[in-house]
């Protein structure tokens, strides 16, 4: 069984956390403040098994501009990113900012997920997809597949899972084990009696 890391990116309230909950059955918003405000503040983590038997770990990143540092921490080391765009709003400021960050970090594999498709009619959906394609032209996302889904109703989720599984069947980029080890930090928090604690994952590729 192969382990891969996938994650989300996109504007606030475009349905990243809801999409992950629909795929995995788990809510990645753990903190009371997140649930009270209905936004993701810190990184969230969960997993699900792909049809091929491989296991996909999922990192849910914040979409709000105030938490962009947490977003950057989350996408480091991902094998695939789902750029989530709400069909009723289209490309928004944090969509573009997250696209720029993903490009700078060298993310190779991405899927464009048009979410909330249940809220718009077919004509509007075509206009949004055209807008997205124009926005992606000339970027590393230009040839990324576009999947139309609704995390609320389940529309298109099976096809999305199949696309993720298909893209992960190719060899993920081999990690360079000859350089100085680097630990992607997932979370930073304070615990009484222990002080500041960081968590992350360091794996041997040998």
Listing of model-derived features with the role each one plays in the protein:
Residues 19-22, 94-101, 127-135, 159-167:
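Alpha-helical scaffold elements adjacent to nucleotide-binding pockets in ATP/GTP-utilizing enzyme cores
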Residues 6-10, 14-22, 66-72, 80, ...:
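P-loop/Walker A NTP-binding module and the surrounding RecA-like catalytic core of P-loop NTPases
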Residues 134-205:
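Conserved catalytic-core segments of large NTP-driven translation/proteostasis enzymes
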Residues 1-57:
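Conserved G1/Walker A P-loop phosphate-binding module
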Residues 13, 19, 38, 60, ...:
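Residue-level signature of catalytic and energy-coupling elements of molecular machines
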